Amino acid sequence: MRFLIPEGSRVLELGCGSGRLLAEVKPTLGVGVDFSPAMIETARRNHPQLTFVQCDVESPEEMANVEGQFDYIVLSDTIGSLEDCQVTFENLHRFCTTETRIIVAYYDQLWGPLLRLAEITGRKMPTEQQNWLETGDIVNLLELADFEIVKRDWRQLIPRAWLGLGSLVNRYIAPFPGIRRLCLRNYVVARSLKALDHRELSVSVVIPARNEKGNIEPAVNRLPKFGSHQEIIFVEGHSQDGTLDEMRRVQSLYPELDIKVMVQDGKGKGDAVRKGFDTAGGEVLMILDADLTMPPEDLPKFYEAIASGKAEFVNGSRLVYPMEEGAMRFLNHIANETFSLLFTWLLNQRFTDTLCGTKVLLKSDYQKISANRRYFGDFDPFGDFDLIFGAAKLNLKVAEVPIRYASRTYGETQISRFRHGWLLLRMVLFAFRKLKALD
């Protein structure tokens, strides 16, 4: 749960018990609700920095005593004792913003007999008759209540202390496909559809470029107008073909456009993207590769996905439509397919093309990714996975926009297939350790 909820969040827990879990996630605003007066008294005594309310979470009248909106709403094992899960979910919308995440955690139905045996033998606290819901049941109830599933996860294959191997098995074996469906704990993360609305947003298009002189003016000419304001940011990467001079020429040639030109301080696309994003003034941040193999004409689709609220992180995909001949080398294509399967599993959201350069998100979400970058560290020279992993850590809703990948018309690829392939393999292992092999 501490992985899903960043420290300093506003958290509402329904069925908080003694308040232990709520205190562990270290919220700036923590509100716990429970129907048991004894539990509420214990929680208030143990965690005076948090707020606890004694009421029935299924009663709208009693829940009126809880005010405000929250970043996370947690139901940990609570759905097992609810009379009507769907109605309870429906009553949560008033606590939700567009950024709120509902987290439902529960024991898997498969473990029911063993848990009852543990109660009989005194190894687990007895509970009343439970709703033994499968993950699919929880997903269905949330969708009926107008919530959209962001991702699902499964944890804890065996008790931690079992023969001293519990932690090892749970970290390094339990997350694998097939095995994970046998885990004790299910997690479903969802967001409110009722909180979504279409907004007109300003846009910053960041174009990192190294030795792309012939693509600078076409990038400006081919970029459609969309958003309440459009800013174009060229970030030059120490080129040797006059790219920087061409950027300045184009900036002077189109004074009616908001064009900015800067030179990156370090090396690599990731460094260039971070410099551009940190400078950007738009509410929506976009990456457009200067080779223009991703058609600039497709960017309004990415914008619409963000502005409509349908997605919070939009990734391009070159692997859906047929490509132009020579647009992608065979080995690159195989690598993309392989890494896409791996990252779909690692991130619990669908990714068909992690290496597509075009990625779009709100600046407010990017700032959260940047603030939490210490969790992953400075590991990614590409910049793609810094954003993808950060979005996964924030539980952002991901969508992919298929694009028709075109051949280069100027310059040569900046990608060294084998060196970058080795780095990508290292990132898979890194992601497994940071996203799957959790304590």
PLM feature spans:
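Class I SAM-dependent methyltransferase SAM/SAH-binding core
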Residues: S18-S59
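Hydrophobic helical membrane-anchoring modules
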Residues: N170-V203, I207, E212-G214, P218-K225, ...
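Acceptor/aglycone-binding surface of glycosyltransferases and processive sugar-polymer synthases
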Residues: W111-N131, Q264-T279, P296-G377, P381, ...
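A short glycine-rich, Lys/Arg-flanked "PGG" loop and its adjoining helix->strand segment in the class I
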Residues: Q86-T98
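Conserved beta-strand signature within the Rossmann-like core of class I S-adenosyl-L-methionine
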Residues: E99-Y106
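A conserved acidic beta->alpha catalytic loop
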Residues: E236-D245
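Short aromatic/hydrophobic "clamp" motif used to bind/position activated sugar donors
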Residues: L285
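Conserved donor nucleotide-binding strand/loop of the catalytic core
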Residues: V53, L244-T279
